[in-house]
Amino acid sequence: MGKATLAVFADSDSSNMNESFAHLHFAGGYLPSDSKGWRTIIPSLLAAVCLVGFVGNLCVIGLLLHGVWKRKPSMIHSLILNLSLADISLLLFSAPVRATAYVKGVWDLGWFVCKSSDWFTHMCMAAKSLTFVVVAKVCFMYASDPAKPVGTHNCTIWSLLGAIWVVASLLPLPEWFFSTTRHHAGVEMCLVDVPAVAAEFMSLFGKLYPLLVFCLPLLLAGFYFWRAYNQCKIRCAKTQNLRNQMRSKQLTVMLLSTAVTSALLWLPEWIAWLWVWHLKAGGPMPPQGFIALSQVLMFSISTVNPLIFLMMSEEFKAGLKGIWKWMITRKPVVTSEVQEVPAGNIETLPGKAPSPETQTCIPDTDRCGSPDSSKETTDKVMVPILPDVEQFWHERDVGPSAQDNDPIPWEHEGQETKGCN
């Protein structure tokens, strides 16, 4: 029955469909489309965005965690890691739900997914927006004095990140309360069902939420980034700590580019959101294509952010080069078999005779080791001793020569010379 009704909807005229659904407020990314093209194009775009964004964010997270493992984490690196975690959460959980809803045209993902879909998406986006404000503030502090480290205590970092996610989860909470599944025209839909008692509250929510999540954070972040950039321009004129000043300027430009790009790609989604939430009775519905593309642009932020980090950050580029060199230079360990030569066979090929250095040298690691290790090495390595050399040292130790006991060796030196002649 549901599929038959959906087929009728798909074949119907778009104007009739918009009129029949004009009074409905869809949620969870669900949007019944009267075009088969949109039901194919939008999921394909979301799949491409998810694939590229997942790989990019995975690289950023891996490089940041590797840096944390090698040295103490910094505040800015922790905030960038928070942005990447929010991005990868959107690509793993929210975007697939939107793509599935577009493909099927009927909401069959259940009541819980309907209630939590918009809330989870807006929670991650709000966390990113608040993180940009903190990043801009920390960036300004770093630009003011690059030699002075910004508070990097683990307790401070974890408290700040926890506060960001708590606030971000509370702001879109009304969407959780009023999103639910409803049957309409024989089709299961995910809708925002606001009772008459809460109509005024939701009207106020529709006005305040964009201000708290988008406009105000954008203004604060822009203010701090502007001050940080001006501070970098002033300090770059001086010659002291030039390296830290250049690094501060590059960091400011990179984070500013990320914030501006995110704001521009998020703007169409807010236009569609405000249009739907403040739609008057009998007013025109926003075009379905505009709503669908605005959601694709919103998710594409999670793909663009890691690309900006990887292209503009010298640390990330150095990390990628290191990984690439490790991958192309890694070779399997080749174990060479050492052939034992009999003790009596000391013949060697011409031109292949070992030099005296190779016969008597000892590795530096064994030479610099402890006395016990050097003793064990001496026991294991048996150096052959020639008979003449052994006899010489034996006679020298047992019977000292007359020359050693001669009190006036210079008088006998001439006699020895004559005897030799």
Swiss-Prot record:
State its role: Orphan receptor.
Tell me the residue ranges located in the Cytoplasmic compartment per UniProt: 66-74, 144-156, 226-258, 311-421
Which body tissues produce this protein? Exclusively expressed in neurons of the habenular complex. The expression is particularly prominent in the medial habenular nucleus, whereas the lateral habenular nucleus exhibited a lower level of expression.
**Region named Disordered:** 346-381, 394-421
Query: Which GO CC terms are listed, alphabetically?
Result: cholinergic synapse; plasma membrane; presynaptic membrane; synaptic vesicle membrane
What does the UniProt keyword field contain? Cell membrane, Disulfide bond, G-protein coupled receptor, Glycoprotein, Membrane, Receptor, Transducer, Transmembrane, Transmembrane helix
- State where the protein is found: Cell membrane
Which species is listed as the source? Answer: Rattus norvegicus
Membrane-spanning residues: 45-65, 75-95, 123-143, 157-177, 205-225, 259-279, 290-310
Which family does the record assign?
A: Belongs to the G-protein coupled receptor 1 family.
Query: SUPFAM superfamilies of this UniProt entry?
Result: Family A G protein-coupled receptor-like (SSF81321)
The GO annotation for biological process reads:
G protein-coupled receptor signaling pathway; regulation of synaptic vesicle exocytosis; response to acidic pH
Cysteine disulfide links: 114-190
Write down a Pfam family by its short name.
7tm_1
Give the superkingdom in one word: Eukaryota
Does the entry feature the keyword Glycoprotein, yes or no?
Answer: yes
Query: What spans does the record annotate as topological domain Extracellular, numbered to this chain?
Result: 1-44, 96-122, 178-204, 280-289
Which portions of the chain have biased composition (kind: Basic and acidic residues)?
364-379, 409-421
Q: Which residues are glycosylated?
A: 18
Q: What is this protein called?
A: Probable G-protein coupled receptor 151
Q: According to its record, how does it sit in the membrane?
A: Multi-pass membrane protein
- MF term (GO), any: identical protein binding
Q: Does the keyword Amino-acid biosynthesis apply?
A: no
